[in-house]
Swiss-Prot record:
Compartments where found: Cytoplasm
Presence of the UniProt keyword Transmembrane in the record: no
Gene: IRL
Active site: K134
Described purpose of this protein according to its UniProt entry: Reductase that may be involved in a late step of alkaloid biosynthesis.
Self-association and partners: Monomer.
Keywords: Alkaloid metabolism, Cytoplasm, NADP, Oxidoreductase, Stress response
The EC number(s) this enzyme carries: 1.3.1.-
GO biological process terms held by the UniProt record: alkaloid metabolic process; cellular response to sulfur starvation
GO MF annotation, one: NADPH binding
UniProt family annotation: Belongs to the NmrA-type oxidoreductase family. Isoflavone reductase subfamily.
Pfam families: NmrA
Designated name of the protein: Isoflavone reductase homolog IRL
């Protein structure tokens, strides 16, 4: 007899990635709850999203990250807590850690990660300070003795691929493409729904407990030059490539306003430093989602780019 699926609570479920996590949890058969501040919002788009959750069998729990009683109550009904809170609330996840510790019943916690592996990044400021908050939540989780999985996913496809890998461009290249570094460093692009699927699959998997879950599908690991060549093949056009050396990238980061400097710093970490791919996974600390779940039919970069033709 198959073991019963864990009850999953999603915090931040109405956000950009969170809605995918809620949908994946319900689709994969988990009793799923979403913590929401308002179960009947006046905003039509938010109301439609919540209705789609309910139609999928998701329970809406009225609560707030800043209301500890409601937070503890929500956590007590869950086996697994997945946080998908945005960058402005990363540090405030300490409240969630406290609630999980107080409730005492959670078997796995996924803090809001889904980008670079914050324990091994050399990313420059101002992004360094933002990722530092994620490091703090990791240490707080471990100190509290809470079983965890840290999901690391590289670039969201919805951010990186519409511009064909260009960091600051408004859209696909028209006549030229701006490339950070030499363009040969490999990066990872993952469709948001696939990030959610791999994350939820790991929720009940003992192999992912107290490990970093690296989500880097093989067909979606490619350099900026390879990405541009793929786009050229699809469009039948050739684009002039303007390569920006690292020194110029660092200077641009220092001189650009927020949020452009943060976006550039992340691009520098991925495309110049190779932080999404330039390492071997230490099996004592991490697992490869593609190896754990080889049957997942993920959206390839090749397929994703067809949306823009």
């Amino acid at each position: 007899m198959a073991s019963e699926k864990s009850k999953i609570l999603v915090v931040g479920g109405t956000g950009y990635l969170g809605r995918h996590v809620v949908a994946a949890s319900a689709r994969l058969g988990h009793p799923t709850s979403a913590l929401v501040r308002d179960t009947a919002p006046s905003d039509p788009a938010k109301a439609a999203l919540l209705k789609s959750f309910q139609d999928a069998g998701v329970t809406l729990l009225k609560g707030d990250l800043y209301d500890q009683a409601s937070l503890v109550s929500a956590v007590k009904g869950a086996d697994v807590v997945i946080s998908v809170l945005g960058s402005m609330q990363i540090a405030d996840q300490s409240r969630l850690v406290d609630a999980i510790k107080e409730a005492g019943n959670v078997k796995r916690f996924f803090p809001s990660e889904f980008g670079l592996d914050v324990d091994r990044t050399g990313i420059v400021e101002p992004a360094k300070s933002i990722l530092g908050a994620k490091v703090g939540i990791r240490r707080a989780t471990e100190a509290a003795g809470i079983p965890y999985t840290y999901a690391v996913a590289g670039f969201f496809a919805g951010f990186g691929l519409p511009k064909v890998g260009q960091v600051l461009a408004p859209g696909p290249p028209a006549d030229k493409a701006v490339v950070l570094g030499d363009g040969d460093t490999k990066a990872v692009f993952v469709e948001e729904g696939d990030i959610a699927t791999y994350t939820v699959l790991a929720a009940d998997d003992p192999r992912a407990e107290n490990k970093v879950l690296y989500i880097k599908p093989p067909a979606n690991t490619l350099s900026h030059n390879e990405l541009l060549s793929l786009w050229e093949k699809k469009t039948g056009k050739t684009f002039r490539r303007e390569y920006v050396p690292e020194e110029a990238v660092l200077k641009q980061i220092q001189e650009s306003p927020i949020p452009l400097n943060i976006i550039l710093a992340i691009g520098h970490a991925a495309f110049v430093r190779g932080e999404q791919t330039g390492f071997e996974i230490d099996p004592a600390k991490g697992v490869d989602a593609s190896e754990l779940y080889p049957d997942v039919k993920y959206t390839t970069v090749d397929e994703y780019l067809n949306r823009f033709l």
